[in-house]
Amino acid sequence: MSGGYDLNLFISPPDCNFLCSVCHGVLKRPVRLPCSHIFCKKCILRWLARQKTCPCCRKEVRHRKMVHVNKLQKIIGRLEVKCRNAEAGCQVTCPLAHRKGHQDSCPFELMVCPNEGCMLRVPRGALDEHRQNCQHGAYHRCSLGCGATLGPVERANHNCYRELREAWCQRQQRSRTLVLCLLQHMRKMHRTTGLIRRQLADFLEEDDPLLVGAPQEEAEATPEGSIGVEVWEPQGQATL
């Protein structure tokens, strides 16, 4: 892996004096050897782990003799660079020294979804939308205030007003059905009551002559002068 910065990162081609002779990238954390040659710190340490000589002049090198070139690092830090998410669509350019600060807020920077169990990496600008629809997201109450507890899938299809209207329509339909059932029952009772009343009227019409003629027959069967009362006498009592 290269220890320096990629040349394609820079808006303008960097000066050749800013290049590392080991990785051929722009110097990153430059250090100078006693022989005055400058390299990326990471590159020269890797080199010296294999051999103890300068990559350019082959002179022997000791670690304690390396010096950080802070002035050169500041000059390189002022070079204009592209965002590392330029291919993803970010058009921002900034000094190399400010690149890290931009990455921390770049909307194109890939972020890991914070929901437990989700391994997707999405751009920072789309993270909020992803969290709302993530299948691993937590359940939340409806933000519109209906009180429903919804998961990510339910939230995507949830519509308080539509569901309330559907519930109201269902209730109205049940009410209409109940009223129709009651009306049918009342009509049936009305028909039954009418039938009973007609049968009772017919019965009264048939029995009316009998009820009227009964007193006349009793009067004809009773002799004149008799009160029609039988006198009871105790048995065995002598007649005086």
Swiss-Prot record:
The keyword Signal does not apply. A zinc finger (RING-type) spans 20-58. GO terms for biological process: protein ubiquitination. Keywords: Metal-binding, Zinc, Zinc-finger. InterPro entries: Ubox_domain, Znf_RING, Znf_RING/FYVE/PHD, Znf_RING_CS, Znf_SIAH, Znf_TRAF. GO terms for molecular function: ubiquitin-protein transferase activity; zinc ion binding. A zinc finger (TRAF-type) spans 101-156. It comes from the Eukaryota. The keyword Ribonucleoprotein does not apply. Pfam families: zf-C3HC4_2 (PF13923). This is RING finger protein 151. It comes from Bos taurus.
